[in-house]
Design a protein with these regions (language model features):
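Short hydrophobic/aromatic beta-strand or adjacent loop that forms the aromatic wall/cage
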Residues: 43, 143-148
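Conserved acetyl-CoA-binding loop-helix of GNAT-fold acetyltransferases
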Residues: 81-94, 98
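Conserved GNAT acetyl-CoA-binding A-motif
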Residues: 96-115
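A short, internal acetyl-CoA/4′-phosphopantetheine-binding micro-motif in the GNAT/acyltransferase core
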Residues: 73-81, 110-112
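Short amphipathic alpha-helix that is part of the acyltransferase structural core
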Residues: 1-30
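Conserved active-site tyrosine of GNAT-family acetyltransferases
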Residues: 124, 129
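Conserved beta-strand in the GNAT
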Residues: 47, 53-61, 67-74
Length: 153
């Protein structure tokens, strides 16, 4: 498995589409999924390749002079539980720390609302993210937003 930074905007969108289309339980709203795919072209983009096949990706965006946000991530279902998400995050942590950032943050639906997102929460916590704050209405009342943060220093 190789993790590398992708810079070509078209390739970023192709990878995002190929992965997100298979993860409809998390990305079920077609308009939102398409918006993620389009916006992925403008983010710092890491991809996991099994030989030449992209099997996962992670996108980062700057949210402040010291902070990057993990704003989008996906791994093909058949590659779940194989350490690929962890490898993507570890590579992103190293690269962003080397770029001078101090913190990495991520948002997800608060624990206890949906089983699939409980799995996502456990994943982020297993990587060392710490619960920072919940915004009950950031997205909507049925999807309270949990913010996790991690120090890169």
């Amino acid at each position: 498995m190789e993790i590398r930074i992708v810079t070509d905007k078209t390739e970023k969108q192709q990878i995002a589409r190929s992965v997100l289309e298979t993860l409809r339980q998390w990305f079920e709203v077609e308009e939102a999924r398409e918006d993620y795919i389009v916006k992925s072209a403008d983010f710092l983009f890491f991809a996991a390749f099994d030989k030449d096949r992209p099997v996962g990706f992670l996108c980062l965006k700057e949210t402040g002079k010291d902070t990057m946000e993990l704003c989008l991530m996906g791994v093909l279902k058949e590659y779940h539980r194989k350490g690929i998400g962890r490898m993507l995050v570890e590579k992103a942590k190293k690269e962003t720390a080397d770029m001078g950032y101090s913190f990495l943050q991520v948002k997800t639906v608060q624990m206890g609302i949906y089983e699939d997102y409980d799995e996502t929460n456990r994943f982020y916590r297993s990587l060392g993210f710490k619960a920072f704050e919940v915004f009950p209405l950031l997205w909507d009342e049925k999807n309270p937003c949990q913010v996790y943060v991690m120090s890169l220093k």
